Regions:
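Transmembrane alpha-helical segments in multi-pass inner-membrane proteins
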Residues: 223-224, 229-230, 240-306
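Single transmembrane alpha-helix segments in multi-pass membrane proteins
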Residues: 26-33, 37-88, 113-118, 260, ...
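Transmembrane helix-bundle core of multi-pass membrane transporters
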Residues: 122-192, 218-221, 241-249, 324-325
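Hydrophobic core segments of alpha-helical transmembrane domains in multi-pass membrane transport
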Residues: 16-28, 57, 100, 129-134, ...
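Loop-to-transmembrane alpha-helix initiation sites
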Residues: 12, 121-123, 170-178, 219, ...
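Membrane-helix/interface signature in polytopic inner-membrane proteins
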Residues: 39, 183-223
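Alpha-helical transmembrane segments within multi-pass membrane transporters and channels
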Residues: 89-129, 279-280
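Cytosolic-side transmembrane-helix boundaries in multi-pass membrane proteins
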Residues: 1-21, 25, 203, 209-217, ...
Length: 325
């Protein structure tokens, strides 16, 4: 076997892609409902905000950090934006921009707490998680405008509907935007100074500082990027969820973070891939969507997802030990 073939077969992204194919085959065989177009469309709808959060949190995880505020933050921004649209007649486009601005602001706060004030990432983002959860709880349940209402056009960003009634055809336009974003952020991670410095800080922060990298600045920036994508996730969440409910963000960050680790980000930092994040999120979404079709309910879904995450992290640890030897 050539070195190139060995490299492909040992690439965790390739392994996870095989897992996606295997899971799809198993669920399709066990349930004909799983094969329906509406099921696939629904799975894609609810993967958009998970993927956006996951793309953002990939960068702090590569530096050896984490952001626990992305789930509650996403719901908080969607609630604030929706409340302004419903109660204050703020244009939807302004509310969408506000979601992004709020995400960047909380991301910058996380970055300052971690990168400049040297708080542990877990503690700093746990604090902002509590802040955003509390701020979101001050708002009531908020439906954004639906597709047939003024301002409801933003739903078409993620799902294009052609025709009316039963003859209407729906296309997952959001999937195209997700692929383009993955390509863009993979390029940023691998071919820009920001991406190279992010990897360098995760590999060895002290060595990165000695080489002239402004570690504090780039630590702040990875959390700003994470906040930006959390704000975008808030828009996607509002677009696919009929009503944004306070308190629903708790735990959503686990799917995003889990998908990043399944996709091959190093448990200790220093390496990651946005393409890997994409395939990792699809494993999580396949499990969440497919397991109910084979008779396994929510508790079992969480258990199996947890086991998959443990296996992914163990594989990464074994690979690190093997490369060290």
């Amino acid at each position: 076997m050539t070195k190139k073939k060995k490299s492909i077969l040992s690439d965790q992204r390739f392994i996870v892609l095989l897992v996606i194919i295997a899971l799809s085959a198993v669920f399709s065989f066990m349930s004909k409902e799983f094969r329906q177009y509406t099921t696939i469309l629904s799975m894609l709808d609810f993967s958009y905000y998970d993927l956006l959060m996951a793309i953002g949190v990939t960068f702090p995880l590569i530096t050896g950090g984490v952001d626990l505020s992305i789930g509650t933050g996403m719901v908080c921004y969607a609630l604030i934006g929706g409340t302004l649209v419903r109660s204050n007649n703020v244009p939807v486009v302004v509310a969408m921009l506000l979601c992004v601005v709020l995400g960047i602001a909380i991301g910058a706060l996380n970055g300052v707490l971690i990168g400049i004030m040297n708080l542990p990432p877990f503690l700093a983002t746990l604090c902002t998680c509590m802040i955003t959860r509390g701020a979101g709880s001050l708002c009531s349940a908020t439906p954004w405008p639906t597709l047939n209402q003024p301002g409801g056009w933003f739903h078409s960003i993620f799902k294009l509907t052609i025709g009316q009634g039963r003859s209407a055809s729906r296309y997952p336009l959001g999937f195209l935007w997700m692929i383009l974003l993955v390509i863009l952020m993979e390029f940023v991670l691998n071919h820009t100074k920001f991406g190279r410095y992010t990897n360098a800080i995760g590999s060895n922060k002290e060595a990165a500082a000695l080489s002239g990298i402004n570690v504090k600045f780039y630590h702040v920036m990875v959390y700003v990027v994470c906040g930006l994508f959390t704000g975008l996730a808030a828009i996607a969440y509002a677009a696919v969820t009929p009503t944004v409910q306070p308190g629903t963000g708790a735990g959503l960050e686990m799917d995003a973070i889990g998908g990043v680790f399944v996709g091959g980000v190093a448990a200790s930092g220093g390496y990651g891939s946005v393409v890997g994040t994409l395939v990792g999120i699809f494993v999580i979404m396949l499990l969440k969507t497919g397991l109910p079709y084979v008779g396994l309910q929510a508790n079992w879904q969480q258990i199996i997802t947890g086991v998959v995450l443990i296996v992914a992290v163990l594989i990464d640890i074994l690979k690190e030990k093997k490369s060290a030897h």
